[in-house]
Amino acid sequence: FCNAIHLVEDKSQVMREVSDTLRSGGIFAFNSSFFKGDLTEETSQFYRRWMMRSLRILKNDFGLKPSKEKVMARQALSIAEYTEILEDNDFRVSMTEIEPVEVPLEGWQDISYFEDFIAGALPGVPLKEASRSLVEAAAQIFNEFDLSSVRRDWLSIVAVRQ
């Protein structure tokens, strides 16, 4: 699961199915940039400003606002919660790692075109308008605060089937 496990609604079921498929000693690995603990204080500040600016652009330019629904990508799990689900499904965690990555403006703008990200960040907003507001807001925030990049932490977990 390359940066997708957070999109799965029933993580326990998926891990159970993977466990049923693997033999003892088999490896299940995944990563995610959306987990409890993924945002540093700097990243949180950027993200709040980015989302608030996006909302303002959506309202002012398109007369739109997102729905209040909470989608799967916004229901983040902690390392401990992932570990518990894995252990409940006959896995032993052999490695967890958090890797800090400096993401330039282009990276934030690129993700602004990704449908699953938009559904999490601005649920219910049409893709075209959501993308335009996210891209423009990111550029404005980077410019305003003279940013060259913003850190994002990536979680990687490797587990062994018992």
Language-model segments: residues:
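A short SAM/SAH-binding and catalytic strip from SAM-dependent methyltransferases
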Residues: 1-12, 34
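C-terminal helical/coil "lid" or tail adjacent to the Rossmann-like core of SAM-dependent
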Residues: 93-148
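Conserved class I S-adenosyl-L-methionine
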Residues: 27-59
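A short glycine-rich, Lys/Arg-flanked "PGG" loop and its adjoining helix->strand segment in the class I
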Residues: 12-27
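Core SAM-dependent methyltransferase catalytic element
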Residues: 90-91, 112-114, 151-162
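Short glycine/proline- and acidic residue-enriched helix-loop micro-motifs
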Residues: 63-69
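Short alpha-helix
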Residues: 73-90
